[in-house]
Amino acid sequence: MLAYLQGEAGMLRVKKALEDAKKGSSQVTMCVINLGEVLYIIERERGLVKAHEVLAAIQQLPIEILPVENQTVFNAAHIKANHAVSYADAFAIACAQENRATILTGDKEFETVETLVKVEWLKQV
C-alpha cells in the first residue's frame, strides 16, 4: 500500500490489482493492523492531517479491511515467534493464510515466509 500511496517502485502493480478489484475480477484485502502501520508511517513522516487524508483515500479504494479475530492474533504471534519478520508483517502473513491470499510486496523480509504464503514480488528500482 505504501508503494502505491507514495509512488514507489511497484506502484503500477498495486494499481492494477486495485483496478481488477474495482471490476470485480479479483479481491484486494488488507489486515486492519497493516492499515494502522500505513497510517502511523504517514503520520510520522507527513503529519496527522495527511494521515487522515490517506485514511479517507484508502476507504474509497476497493479494499476490504479485514478485522483481527483472536485466532488471527494467535496465528500472527506464532509466525513472529518462528520467523524473522516484524509483528505487523506477521499479521499480513496470518491474514493472507486465513484468506488464501497473495501478498504483494517488495519487502525482502518476506523471503523467509514464502513457504507459508504466496508472495508476489513488486519490482524494486
Per-segment meaning from a language model:
Residues 2, 36-39, 77:
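Amphipathic alpha-helical segments within well-ordered protein domains
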Residues 41-44, 62:
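Helix-loop "lid/cap" segments that line or gate small-molecule binding pockets
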Residues 64-104:
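Active-site neighborhoods of divalent-metal-dependent phosphate/nucleic-acid chemistry enzymes
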